[in-house]
């Protein structure tokens, strides 16, 4: 028995040695590695004391994320509501957000800050990673980041080469095509080009004319060129253009049970069902937008430090038409045109070493020029309504003033007060009618 025990020991040790040296039948899972540049942070995102959510390229494609709004389904405490067009792009994070004017959540695309809130809602494609940083990020990213920050990174042609084509079709004639090409010319130069077209007939119809109330068509193109003349110096040029044309603001009237129960047979509510009604507008709201975002990133790797510079120019030109009475009657409508240019320059310098102490500092400057015209038009039904109100007011004023004087004279002549007032009003009304009456037609200019 002792012999058997002694002989079994080296056999077991030999088996353990085989496993430790390497088992060819064992399968090792290695997560996808995405290499991105962090010009401001000295530590990896997972090592930083903040709450964040990250998506790699495969996850973005599997979730079918088409724009930033789609992320609100998967990111906690993050919301980007749908207001009916790409114009309105309010972002809320942890309950902090801005409905108008300056945003409270910032967006960076390949290191380029997007400052115009009217350009936040754009089609995302060619994206390799998305980081959502929760909470204030003003220390490193400055203004408009009180609620948080969203960073998007495009696929790097130095790391990925090839041609990708994506075709999709869905309900309500959703259609989309995306094509991109990535090529590495040599060890120092690489480029990528991409383009897309997307559209959908929409889910709502305008009851006034039967048109699609949320029809959308959009297209765009993107180019990127990377140049590494030396081991220390890198250049990254990005240009992105997108055009959107959509029927927007498919708003319908909300009708309650109480309103229906009190509606008469002549009421426009008679025969409707409680809830939100289909859009019914005599003017179909629409939105058109051109945006161009260009940026030049420069990075220099020194001895123990990195210098990063991002210079960008952003262009916005859009047009919006909204039937602001949301009714089949022609009361009021709004048109708005925006023309904006934005220049930004961001410079950051950070340490690059293995010591316990890391430092970073920088500067940011921007110039934003925006011209907005937004006249409100009073249309035919509104002008007719106001004309009638003013005409009635003027007519009654004249009638009462003239009849009062005539009645006083009749009473002084011995007529009773009741008969005098009645006679005076009849006579005055006849006199006004004989003179042509009172007719005021007004037109309200914006």
Language-model region placement:
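Outer-membrane beta-barrel translocator/receptor signature
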Residues: 89, 103, 116, 125-128, ...
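N-terminal plug
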Residues: 24-25, 36-50, 57-84, 100-102, ...
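Periplasmic-side early beta-strands and strand-to-turn transitions of outer-membrane beta-barrels
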Residues: 159-160, 168, 184-283, 316-331, ...
């Amino acid at each position: 028995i002792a012999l058997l025990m002694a002989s079994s020991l080296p056999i077991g040790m030999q088996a353990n040695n085989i496993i430790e040296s390497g088992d060819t039948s064992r399968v090792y899972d290695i997560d996808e590695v995405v290499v991105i540049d962090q010009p401001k942070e000295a530590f990896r995102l997972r090592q930083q004391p903040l709450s964040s959510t990250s998506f790699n390229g495969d996850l973005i494609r599997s979730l079918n994320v088409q724009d930033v709004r789609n992320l609100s389904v998967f990111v906690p405490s993050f919301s980007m509501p749908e207001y009916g067009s790409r114009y309105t792009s309010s972002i809320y994070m942890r309950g902090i957000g801005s409905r108008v004017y300056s945003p409270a959540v910032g967006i960076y695309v390949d290191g380029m800050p997007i400052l115009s809130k009217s350009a936040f809602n754009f089609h995302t494609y060619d994206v390799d990673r998305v980081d959502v940083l929760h909470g204030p990020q003003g220390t490193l990213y400055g203004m408009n980041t009180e609620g948080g920050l969203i960073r998007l990174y495009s696929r790097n042609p130095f790391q990925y080469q090839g041609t990708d084509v994506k075709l999709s079709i869905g309900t309500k004639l959703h259609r989309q095509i995306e094509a991109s090409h990535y090529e590495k010319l040599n060890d120092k130069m690489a480029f990528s080009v991409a383009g897309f077209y997307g559209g959908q007939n929409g889910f709502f119809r305008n009851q006034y004319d039967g048109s699609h109330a949320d029809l959308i068509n959009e297209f765009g193109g993107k180019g990127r060129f990377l140049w590494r003349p030396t081991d220390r110096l890198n250049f990254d040029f990005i240009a992105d253009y997108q055009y959107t044309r959509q029927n927007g603001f498919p708003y319908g009237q909300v009708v309650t049970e109480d309103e229906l129960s009190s509606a008469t047979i002549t009421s426009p509510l008679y025969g409707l069902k409680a809830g939100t009604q289909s859009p019914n507008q005599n003017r179909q709201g629409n939105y058109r937008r051109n945006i161009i975002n260009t940026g030049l990133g420069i990075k220099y790797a020194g001895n123990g430090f990195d210098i990063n510079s991002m210079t960008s120019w952003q262009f916005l030109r859009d047009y919006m038409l909204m039937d602001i009475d949301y009714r089949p009657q022609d009361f009021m409508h709004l048109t708005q045109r925006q023309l904006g240019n934005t220049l930004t320059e961001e410079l950051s310098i950070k340490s690059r070493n293995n010591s316990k102490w890391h430092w970073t500092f920088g500067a940011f400057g921007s110039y934003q020029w925006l011209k907005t015209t937004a006249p409100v038009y009073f249309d035919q039904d509104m002008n007719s309504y106001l004309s009638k109100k003013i005409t009635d007011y003027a007519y009654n004023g004249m009638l009462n003033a003239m009849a009062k004087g005539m009645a006083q004279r009749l009473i002084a002549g011995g007529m009773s007060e009741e008969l005098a007032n009645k006679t005076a009003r009849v006579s005055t009304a006849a006199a006004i009618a004989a003179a042509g009456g009172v007719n005021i037609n007004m037109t309200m200019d914006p």
